[in-house]
Amino acid sequence: MTWITTSLEAARMANRKHGRVLMEIDRLKDILSLDTSHDFHYVKYIDPDGVPVRLYHLTAFGLAMLDVGRGKTALRWKAEKLK
C-alpha cells in the first residue's frame, strides 16, 4: 500500500483545522460502502509536545475523496500529490 500524505499535512495545505479533516474522513468512511481501511489508515502519532494525535495516512484514492478546499495552494498541492 502506498500512502502519499497524512491527514495532518492535508489540513495544513488546505488551511483547515485537523479536526475538520478528521470529521470529513469519518464521514467518508461512513458513506463509502467499500472497505476504506487501507485508503484511510489510522496511526497513533505523538506530537512534539508529547500529546497523542489522531492521524491518518492517505492513499491517492483517499486524498481524491477528501475535500481539501478550493484555494489555489490546496488545489495545486492536491494535484501534485495525485500525479
Model-flagged regions — what are they?
Residues M1-K83:
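An anion-engaging/catalytic patch
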